[in-house]
Amino acid sequence: MHDQLEQAIQDGSGRRGRTGRVARSGLLSRVWRPEGSGVLKPHRSLDAQRVAQLECALWVAYYRGEWIRFLRAAVVVIRHVFGLSWLSTVRASWFLLRATQLWAPYPDNDAAGARRAMERFYRLLKQQSGEPFDPAEAARLEVEWWHLHRIHQHSNADSDERALVDALAALYAYAFRVPDTAVRMAAEQRALAMRYCDQWVSAGCDLQSSLIAQKRAALARSYASLAAAVQPA
């Protein structure tokens, strides 16, 4: 089943035409739009609460090892945020799933494999959007903050989060071509969401835990701050 799905996704990589392009209406026009230089930026009307709810569900599935649920959540998140065609959404979701599965084992994970999968993810976004970023660099920055979060996750709970925040800000700054300082608050709130998530994992991943609401709220603040930071003056 794994090989069949992988082949189907690869078969779709060469398709072009209307179904292979980023939608310029619907969800994309409400959430993401080109600004000035053409960089995809969060729309002013981005629903930070909705995106946070979707990503929080993704985190819950990841830490509970519920990979089918993770894939379903990834499809909803990617479709909602990027407005890709359904084919491209499924392909991007598969690349994200494979990256996280390769990253998940501790301590013996496959960081290089995770980077390759994320490079495929970002290459797909670049193909669909036409944006001038380097998929390999975006993947490197992405997996770097995964690495720093894992170090923090398995160290003292009160250890310094500045390196993690710096890595998140670096990814945002690269993706949206803004100064690190402009997106630092968004990075700080995302790091806070991870702190709540780590506490939730340590406590046993209880679906009734109030920590889920706390990390969802921090993610919402992060997305709201990010959307505000990358808008033109």
Located regions from the model:
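Repeat-mediated protein-protein interaction surfaces in helical alpha-solenoids
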Residues: 27-43, 72-76
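A cross-kingdom marker for long, charged
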Residues: 45, 206-233
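Generic helix N-cap/helix-start motif at coil->alpha-helix transitions
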Residues: 47-55
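Hydrophobic/aromatic side-chain positions at a characteristic register within alpha-helices
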Residues: 62, 103-106
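A conserved position within tetratricopeptide repeats
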Residues: 71, 78-82, 122-129
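Extended amphipathic alpha-helical interaction segments
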Residues: 118-199
